[in-house]
């Protein structure tokens, strides 16, 4: 069974699903849902729509340029059937999926950690810029503490 890709959002299109638009120059466009077809008809650029795969890759929210992703590429040239090669391929699929999952998880975790580091840096810069506010607050707390000590000594 051949699984096609949506021209607009790059999601999977299984057999019996989606629509096909063939232009006058015989260029074929496959769409997974009417939303993608309508955006294509309005000539919306998929890179500027936040939920498409290409825009997520451009914003570094998805893993790209990784060797593990080359296994998914579609080959347009017919190959001679070899039973041994087919068995090796089928037996290696779980291992490939495991490696891919591990790399994607690491990519997401790394992205989150770098975001947290950037937030910490911006918070520290904010504190440095507004240090006078903290000094006023600390001074007020010291005065309150001194007043409590005086009351305790007089009692």
Swiss-Prot record:
The keyword Repressor does not apply. The keyword Zinc does not apply. Keywords: Ribosome biogenesis. SMART domains: TRASH. GO terms for molecular function: structural constituent of ribosome. GO terms for cellular component: nucleolus. GO terms for biological process: ribosomal large subunit biogenesis. Pfam families: Ribosomal_L24e. PANTHER family: 60S RIBOSOMAL PROTEIN L24, RIBOSOME BIOGENESIS PROTEIN RLP24-RELATED. Belongs to the eukaryotic ribosomal protein eL24 family. This is Probable ribosome biogenesis protein RLP24. It comes from Encephalitozoon cuniculi (strain GB-M1) (Microsporidian parasite).
